[in-house]
Amino acid sequence: MDNVVDRHVFYISDGTAITAEVLGHAVMSQFPVTISSITLPFVENESRARAVKDQIDAIYQQTGVRPLVFYSIVLPEIRAIILQSEGFCQDIVQALVAPLQQEMKLDPTPIAHRTHGLNPGNLNKYDARIAAIDYTLAHDDGISLRNLDQAQVILLGVSRCGKTPTSLYLAMQFGIRAANYPFIADDMDNLTLPTSLKPLQHKLFGLTIDPERLAAIREERRENSRYASLRQCRMEVAEVEALYRKNQIPCLNSTNYSVEEIATKILDIMGLNRRMY
């Protein structure tokens, strides 16, 4: 049976709409409803704003239910058009700005694209994030062992346990230089910590995963293979976890966590500074 959509939700911004999406999604996750999400970035002129209003109104006319609208828009004339729609509109930034304005006794100076745009004040941070992404891509899955000492964290684990997506998320979201190193089936007969990693043990972090989940993931990649067999997965996970214990490497079972949660736990456990972009 198909899921019935309870509410249509719009995330609207005159910038990237990332802030509207993140905060709006966080709010909607509190309710047991099925939603249909529509993200509309760069609503920067009246013509586009009117088209967005028409889209909101059309859904209301089709469903008889007011769409929920989370928006972050600087220009008052654009906001006014969106507020004329049949949606239930929430200014996610102003809801926080108003009490802060009163507390700090300062007037805000809103500028479009300030949060996620490039400006002279954040170019160094942006360059650092791009450098972190480049580094992480160059050191994915053990591709290169050069300059490993420049990594802020080195993720270890068996194939398909979440090393690559976690590394990339750390780089893209937090500007962390994250390398990762795989343990493959051929390593299992005499699994030891590679010589190149021993001097960097303080940077090592191990990922593990339930064998049943690992087998299901691998089955999608190589169906009916030894690589994907539950027996093989159990053996590899057991060997890797024993290595972590022997070398006192902090580790995390990734089975029931999202990439965002895994990355955040790694930052916390390893004491790495979060950088928001």
Swiss-Prot record:
Bifunctional serine/threonine kinase and phosphorylase involved in the regulation of the phosphoenolpyruvate synthase (PEPS) by catalyzing its phosphorylation/dephosphorylation. The gene is ppsR. It comes from the Bacteria. HAMAP family: PSRP. ADP binds at G157, V158, S159, R160, C161, G162, K163, T164. Its EC number is 2.7.11.33, 2.7.4.28. GO terms for molecular function: ADP binding; ATP binding; phosphotransferase activity, phosphate group as acceptor; protein serine/threonine kinase activity. Keywords: Kinase, Nucleotide-binding, Serine/threonine-protein kinase, Transferase. This is Phosphoenolpyruvate synthase regulatory protein. Belongs to the pyruvate, phosphate/water dikinase regulatory protein family. PSRP subfamily. It holds the Pfam family Kinase-PPPase.
